[in-house]
Every structure is written in C-alpha cells, then in structure tokens.
Curated annotation (Swiss-Prot):
The EC number(s) this enzyme carries: 6.1.1.11
Name this polypeptide is given: Serine--tRNA ligase
Subcellular location field: Cytoplasm
HAMAP family on file: Ser_tRNA_synth_type1 (MF_00176)
Protein encoded by which gene: serS
Catalytic activity: tRNA(Ser) + L-serine + ATP = L-seryl-tRNA(Ser) + AMP + diphosphate + H(+); tRNA(Sec) + L-serine + ATP = L-seryl-tRNA(Sec) + AMP + diphosphate + H(+)
Alphabetic keyword roster: Aminoacyl-tRNA synthetase, ATP-binding, Cytoplasm, Ligase, Nucleotide-binding, Protein biosynthesis
UniProt-annotated binding residues for ATP: 261-263, 348-351
Signal peptide range in chain numbering: none
Record carries keyword Protein biosynthesis: yes
Length: 426
C-alpha cells in the first residue's frame, strides 16, 4: 500500500508515475474521501475536547454545590454525538483503506517505460544456447514414452494442467529441490523455513494478492482459507504485525512449497506439458531489509537465483520488466528467462522483485532502527530460486542426446545417487 501522506502531498505526481504502468489513479475519489475524512476527524476531535471540558465543569460545579444535572445531560448528548462521529470516521477510514488497497506500487525511476513484455529490456545473458546435430525433442516427447511424465493420469486424477511424475523423473524433481535448498542455505546465507500451504485472507492482503486478484486463487470458502499461489505469501507474512530487532535484519528466508493457481485468463496458453500447471513447486527466496539496503539486496537476490542456472549449465538471460509488465506490488522486477530448445525461445523461470515498503505497510512489518530506537517499515523482496517444474523442463531439453537420454548436470549427481544418465531404454 502506498503511503497516504505521499498521496496527500504529491497526488498529481504519484498519478503520473502510476500512469507509466497503465494504471489510472482516481484522484477525484481520493481527494473527496480524504477531504471527508479530514472534516469528520476535525469534528470528532472538537467534540472530544468539548466533552472533556464539560466533564471537568461538572466536577467544578459539584464542588460549588450547584445543580449539575443540566451539565450531565449536555455531556450525555455530546457523548452520543461523539459516538456517531466516531462511527462515521471509522466507516470512512475503512472506505479509504479499501481504496488505497487497490492502488499498485509506484514504479522505480530505473524501470523501463512500456505497457507490455515487448518493452522489457535485456540486461545480460549467460551461456550460449546449445546447437544440436539431431532433431530436438521437447520435454513432453522426452518424458512421455517411458511414462516419466504421465499427463493422462494427472488429468484422470484431477483434470487439465495436472501431471504425475514417475521413477527417475520424480527423483530428478526431488533432486532439484534439495540442490536448490542446499545452495541457498549453505552458500547464500538463507534460513530454511517450512510454512503452511493454506493461508488466511489477511496474509494475501499483506502481500497484495487480495483484494484485486482473488480470481487467480483457489479458495476454500467454508473455512476461510486459500491455497498459496507462492511461498512469498506465508514467508513474507512471517513479519506481519511484528517489530524485528536490529540484530534480526537483514533477514533471508528460503522455502520449498507447492503453489496453486487457477490460471484464470490463461485459457489456451501452454496447454502442452509442464510450463503452466494448476499445481507446481517452487523454491522461494524472501529478504526483509532496511530501506537503504533494498536495492543492493535486489541485485544480490537475483544473483542467487542465477547461480542455480549456472550450476545446472543452463543458458539464460535477465530482463528488466517495463512498468506495465510488472506485478501489482513491485517497484522493480527482473525476470530470469531460461533457454528452452524445445520451444526455441527463452521462458521465465524466476521473477525477482523489490517491493520497497509497499507490502510492509499493508502488513505492518517493521524493524527497530538501532540509531533512533524507533520502529520503521521494512523493505521486502522475493524471487524464485527457482520454479522447480520449469527447471526440470530446462534440464531435460538442454541436456538431451540423440537417443532421448538425459545427461544429469554434475551439480545434481550427488542428489541422484551418482546417476549420470537417465536412459528411457533401461
């Protein structure tokens, strides 16, 4: 959520910056709500002051032996008026808060202009896409014949966009998770956390999925729970309604969870294979840092996600998303896109974002500034390190041979019991 003071003091400038991402801020509605709030707040304060003055007068009149009943009746009437004003103020503040909850984050000045992915800017590349001297198979063709990837049974068990993995494919999937967790905890300084896969609405409001994106979520309405769309939600909310001490920040968390998304609006997209599933898994990186550290933290976090791809010998590129292509809560996002030979293109495998204090303000996540001793809002960041299913796809397609065998990257072999080749003929 944006700082209300920013909107009060810099309304037109903020509206112009939000327009970069294609969002039209309703300045008239905000100005009206804010004016009404201020008017009622002033009226409420005046009533409180007047009631306090009259209450004090009762004591003075009583000490003089005067009749205090008229004063008591007046104080009672003022109390009723004050209660009514406080109710109106509370309702108006709730309306204003709901309005603020629907406003996305302001893009950082370094974010490229543009309204869609065509305006994203390539920052760097790593690795060269492999040149094959045989017809390239995509991951479906590599995984189906042996039954490693069983889309038919997944559809029978649940429906479209679900998959069963068997044998060495399930083992490889598990190996990727363990490899990522070990890398981030041992080399990058993250604390591993295990979190609930079901969360309440407050958690989703804190990170920005609610109220605007409820259609993308799986909702267990009778219990008030939602299946998590990403570990970002429960992990970032570890700091909700909390004041961390200076020694606890910066904090780095890593968590492996399943993720559940309805894929509303994705009908007809990536219907083949593992690229877009209702249920998939990610290893998520979250950082909670003081404001002055967040931009360095974004570069570091992005590098941590990149390191996974480098160790798996997978070519990729890093893209700075333009203002119109960023997520609702983000101030700046880098997408890491891995090369997929089966599609002959780069596909997103991680989004690394700095939210500044946007999420922290929504969830009241703070730390105590050691210099002032006062609580200040944290800056929050997150990124996939990595999406496990898409990493699996990339390993299959980039490390295949002419016989349809998969050569296991050296970094994964200890997690595969020393296995060097997955051979569908064996």
């Amino acid at each position: 959520m944006l700082d209300p003071k920013r909107l009060r003091n810099e309304l037109e400038e903020t509206a112009a910056r939000l327009a970069r991402r294609g969002f039209q801020l309703d300045t008239e509605t905000f100005a009206r709500l804010e004016a009404e709030r201020k008017q009622i707040q002033v009226h409420t304060q005046e009533l409180q002051s007047e009631r306090n003055s009259r209450s004090k007068a009762i004591g003075q009149a009583k000490a003089r032996g005067e009749d205090i009943e008229p004063l008591k009746a007046e104080v009672s009437r003022m109390g009723e008026a004050l209660a009514e004003a406080e109710t109106r103020l509370s309702a108006l503040q709730a309306e204003l808060d709901e309005f603020l909850m629907g406003i996305p984050n302001v893009p950082h000045a370094s974010v490229p202009d543009g309204l869609d992915e065509k305006s994203n800017v390539e920052i760097r590349r790593w690795g060269e896409p492999r040149r094959f001297d045989f017809p390239v198979r995509d991951h479906v063709a590599l995984g189906e014949p042996k039954g490693w990837l069983d889309f038919e049974t997944g559809a029978k068990l649940a429906g479209a966009r679900f998959t069963v993995k068997r044998g060495d494919m399930a083992r490889l999937h598990r190996a990727l998770v363990q490899f990522m967790l070990d890398l981030h905890t041992r080399e990058h300084g993250y604390e591993e956390v295990y979190v609930p896969y079901l969360v309440n609405a407050d958690s989703l409001r804190g990170t920005g999925q609610l109220p605007k994106f409820e259609a993308d979520l799986f909702h267990i309405s009778e219990h008030g729970y939602y299946l998590i769309p990403t570990a970002e939600v429960p992990v970032t909310n570890l700091a909700r309604d909390t004041i961390l001490e200076a020694a606890q920040v910066p904090a780095r968390f890593v968590s492996h969870t399943p993720c559940f998304r309805s894929e509303a609006g994705s009908y007809g997209k990536d219907v083949r294979g593992l690229i877009r599933q209702h249920q998939f898994e990610k290893v998520e990186l979250v950082q909670l840092v003081p404001a002055e550290q967040s931009w360095d933290a974004l570069e570091a976090l992005t590098g941590h996600a990149e390191k996974v791809l480098q160790k798996l010998e997978l070519p990729y590129r890093v893209m700075a998303l333009c203002a119109g292509d960023m997520g609702f809560s983000s101030a700046k996002t880098y997408d890491i896109e891995v090369w997929l030979p089966g599609q002959e293109t780069y596909r997103e495998i991680s989004s690394c974002s700095n939210f500044e204090d946007f999420q922290a303000r929504r969830m009241l996540a703070r730390y105590r500034n050691p210099e002032t001793g006062k609580p200040e809002l944290l800056h929050t960041l997150n990124g996939s390190g990595l999406a496990v299913g898409r990493t699996l796809v990339a390993v299959l397609e980039n490390h295949q041979d002419a016989q349809g065998r998969i050569h296991i990257p050296e970094a994964l072999r200890p997690y595969m019991g020393g296995l060097e080749v997955m051979d569908p003929s064996v």
